[in-house]
Amino acid sequence: MAEPRVFLKENRGRIEENYLEQAKNLPRVFAPVDEKLQKCTEEVALACKYLYAFMPYSDIGNYPFEVFLDYAENGVRLWKENPQVADLPEEIFLNYVLFHRVNEEEIAQCRTYFRAEIGSRIQGMNFREAALEVNYWCAEEATYHCTDDRTLSAISVYRRGNGRCGEESVFTVNALRSVGVPARQVYAPKWSHCDDNHAWVEIWCDGKWYFLGACEPEEILNKGWFTNASSRAMMIHSRVFDTKIPEGEVIGTDGMVTMLNELKRYAVTKEITVTVKDTQGLPAEEAEVSFEVLNYSEYAPIAEKKTDSKGTARLTTGLGSLHISARMCSDGEWFYAETVMNTEKEDNCELCLVPQDKRNDGESEEWTAADIFAPHDAPVNTDMPTPEQKAKGNKRLAAANVHREQKVRNWSNPECERFLEKKVNRIEEAIAASYREDLLGVLTEKDRTDCISDVLEEHLELSIPYHGMMKKDTFVSYVLNPRVDDEVLQKYRREIKKHFSRAEKQELRDDPSRIWNLIEKAIISRPEKERSSVITTPAGCIRTCTGSFLSKKILFVAIARTLGVAARLNPHDRSMEYMENGRFVPVLARTEKNCTLILKAGETVQWKYFQNWSIAKLENGRYTSLKLGAENFEDQILNLPLESGNYRILTSNRLPNGNMFANEYHFEIQPGETKEIELVLREADLEDMLENISMPEFMLKTEDGTEVKASDLTADGKHILMFLEEEKEPTEHILNEMMEQEEAFAGYAEQIIFVVRSKEALETPTLSKALAKLKNIQIYYDDFSEIINTLGRRMYVDPDKLPLIIVTNGTLNGIYATSGYNVGTGDMLLRLM
């Protein structure tokens, strides 16, 4: 007779050890946790201990035991009832089925609920089949919607029915884990071919990882709209919170979180070697090497490593350009070096450190060009659904869309309604009632979809005594407002109030800067026990006596507001400020901005910060971009007050093929100095802008409904495909540009293909006028339900913006594409033809 399985037999010892360490460090918090664990079964208690052992301190402070109990009980039930789950390697089960956190989202109970909703749909399925089915359920419940940076909990995404890609993937991972399918979120932290990033989901089955698009179901695994885009990435990573690291290349840490390199599953890769030498030309051991891509006109890190005893660091990456920097501190002095490397052509590079204060010594201040190459389109995942699978998937997705749209139609958060509709029973509550809509109004759209009435009630009740002491706008925004940054909205005012005596409260009101002194004494930072982007709430900081620097700054604002002092984090640099004599003053003395940089725009370029230019300061061996606010050029001039030091200006021109023409300007500015620099954007030649992208076959229809292959339409020479949205300004604009150059376009009319939804579109004024002037243009029809998205994604332009214009040269070979409103597209098309 086989011995009964023992839950987490291989990891039991280290779980207990790590749990005890956490409890030792935070005894006040863990005492009630230990009491509640005594009431759990042995398996559930051990599962809870695993969660507590490897969660960030912020989770320990922010959430009650009952939240994690939901995850533990569901995980144990899956292990007991599902043989597939019980057969998983323990590390896979712990990290990717049991664990509560996916990335930086708010944590809320969801697993038991999701399992109840999904369980019957996957009865008898293996992990592969279950993953595909769960993703259809996810599509029925949520879809993409651009929102702010705060990451919703999985249950909030489910309730409101949408989220950005990071939230969709958090939701999908939780849904998969709820029914025992091992799952994780993976990220392209920054694309190389466009200014953006993306997150999706991987599932583990048959001993391997496979991927899928969150809430974007397909009939097969390893298929998503991002398949081609991911082949052009320089890095794709996953993360693990456990200290026992699975196999894989570690590419950096974020506090307690380890980042793993997953790129080989998506792109053609190679290993590169960086050698760092000190000022004497000797190997620099333990130098920090940052691998960066140019994105949003700044160098953004995608991986970080330390050099070995030979001064070398190695990275597996894609075939494109990386900006590589190295830094090292010796005897209190920082040293720095940087270069740009094209990994397609180079295997190795060498960096020689110099003191950062001498970074610009001996260099003339002038623009230096840098060519940044995106990896070529080279998908390694080429599986495609059969026509039958595709038809089945389209039908199921259409049904999912109908279900979701019915679900979210007219949906609103009932907690908001409950808060607004609370009965006013006493005269003094009438004042509070007048501020209910003001409180909701100061919250973000996202806040209003997941806020809780009881939380808002406490903030309202305990702030009302101060309402007559300042202007209403100030009171609402900087005292009543429960939101400080991107923290989880929770109660904290009552807990803060009882923490101080009446005399202490008055002393802090009289001198709010003393609040920070108290915080610095009482709250310690343990970055090695945190995830930098996960904030400890004000109440969590007080409970655990720990918090990151950002968490402590949020606590300052929370205490000030609780005491009736208007306070905020400065929207540009997140510095703490409180109101004094009608204006905000800083809590910490800022470094004096004792220099002036005068930037000249020139005549031809419209400069947009973090689109085609940025400026960064070199400090502690690292360039950090300045967070400019609404500063605009006036009469082609921008005056920037700066601190003295070394700076780097970047300008970038993103080409249609994904490459970038960059310009760098390094300079030093001294105290009291005024320096003038003219921004310069590098121009591109036509041949630099083109690509050769193989487009998938697709069908268009003639007026009588006959289907025509796109391969036949594009077979000979160059063609212009134009998917038009009649009577909308972007389409009207390109049609007008073509008519303004009627004679030039007439010579190519037979090579121009207009695609519209219906014959009625041809009768609209501008389109009918264009067809009358350019008589030989070909007309075809499509419903725009699928082809637009497929072609837009394939050509790396926004598929949600029309018109979609593609220039081909040969059968299904796309050489140029654009979408939406773009001035000068007509001229570009003529150049290309």
Stretch-by-stretch model annotation:
Residues 799-820:
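A short, hydrophobic beta-strand/beta-hairpin element that forms part of a small beta-sheet core
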Residues 3-160, 388-544, 554:
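Secondary-structure boundary elements
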